[in-house]
């Protein structure tokens, strides 16, 4: 799928204003590495970071830098020696200095309180930046443009820049700075397989005879780079094209059903929820979308209820309670719709052998409620 198509898709996305984007990029794009204070100017550039126990943020910061052409062959210098760090072209997560003009990106000093929002007005994220977030802020647009094969001015770059920060880099910033996801109370379950946790486990254990961290840090850089590129590939090749499908489905919804509350997706399995909420907020339909119908991988039809919120298990309008947990003939008899396959016990999704049957399941559910739900009353994020 060509970049021209993706640009067309992105013209409808709620982007920041041009001035905000230009300001952000002005703040966040440093020059190429300065001249190195070394005799051999042909030597590869040096990226400095601290030695000893390593963390996800500096591993990601170094990995992102080495994806750039000017740092692709860079030497990673792991030390806390100020004299050795002074010889580095760029220093991350050590040194007690944040100075983009000198390519110094530490966040541990008492005076450092910067966030994506404070350094890039117009961006909403207020999590204190780690070295990963600082490198991403200053080099992210350039890096993404290179990886996506487009220019930094392409609106696709700014859109994916935001998605990658919110859904990948910000988590690393928060974990490294000790910022909890919740304000108070005990967590209901443990999260032990996060990216930061997996990087941490690449350090030597306390009782290993060999406490050298160099090999582990190289593995950590490989790990975070692979996951960053996997996530980027998803947003470029799956998330963006899905928006076009959802937009077209919304435009055609009255041809599916006169209520305008049922959306039919041409291709099942695409990530539709986030796009649906965003498009609803832009288009402001008079009634909220209640159901989405689509085919599954087996070619059967699904009718899925739209959640009240993006990550909620509560539906705007669940399938009728008497149908829930039933299958096949038992469901046919209760619903009065032949060819049913199942309805989930919570009522959030059901299946049918045919498109018309799935549509009838949605219509029958709409007919049993008292009145349509105005979009203003539907919880939309």
UniProtKB/Swiss-Prot annotation:
Gene Ontology BP term (one): mRNA processing
EC code(s) of this entry: 3.1.-.-
A GO molecular function held by the record: 3'-5'-RNA exonuclease activity
Pfam families: MYG1_exonuc
Transit peptide interval: 1-47
N6-acetyllysine modification, residue list: 267, 273
GO annotation, cellular component aspect: cytoplasm; mitochondrial matrix; mitochondrion; nucleolus; nucleoplasm; nucleus
Disulfide bond is among the record's keywords: no
Cellular localization per UniProt: Nucleus, Nucleoplasm; Mitochondrion matrix; Nucleus, Nucleolus
Region forming the signal peptide: none
Keyword set, alphabetical order: Acetylation, Hydrolase, Mitochondrion, Nuclease, Nucleus, Transit peptide
Broad class of the protein's primary localization: nucleus
Function: 3'-5' RNA exonuclease which cleaves in situ on specific transcripts in both nucleus and mitochondrion. Involved in regulating spatially segregated organellar RNA processing, acts as a coordinator of nucleo-mitochondrial crosstalk. In nucleolus, processes pre-ribosomal RNA involved in ribosome assembly and alters cytoplasmic translation. In mitochondrial matrix, processes 3'-termini of the mito-ribosomal and messenger RNAs and controls translation of mitochondrial proteins.
Family the UniProt entry places it in: Belongs to the MYG1 family.
Protein's name according to its UniProt entry: MYG1 exonuclease
